Amino acid sequence: MIFVTVGTHEQPFNRLVEAVDQLKGSGTINEDVIMQTGFSTYEPKYCEWHKLLPYAQMKEKVAEAHIVITHGGPASFIMPLQIGKIPIVVPRQLQFNEHVNNHQVEFTKAVAERMGNIIPIYDITQLGNAIQCYAEFISSMQSNGLHTNNAQFNSTLEKIAEKMFIRKEA
């Protein structure tokens, strides 16, 4: 199952909701899709959807999902990260009137670059590929060993220790 959440921001996120619905309708997505559509005005035709879900149900859907797709709000994509899942993150963009500014784009880019534990999608036409290649993406992310905070901390600490204790030969 794929779970999609657009959060609770009052502006619609039709671009994401419609894109996922069309991918399901075209057969690009073969598994069940459950969406939390928030204030989006597009009503999915091929996916199960709910305007809003209670927090407990959100956690349950995230835990059950094979793939979690979120908007760029930190609370939404931190939830799957906390249980070891790598989310596909599609930030809301000002140019599509999905938010009041581009802070979700900026934050998503920063997290993707610094942490390397999310799959960012800025161009919605790339979403189908990210879903189809999800297993390969997460496999490559996990093989670099930097998909968790602990792994990143350990890696950074190791580099610092090496610099401190490796002496140059005279």
Q: Model regions: which residues?
A:
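Nucleotide-activated sugar donor-binding and catalytic core shared by glycosyltransferases
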Residues: 1-170
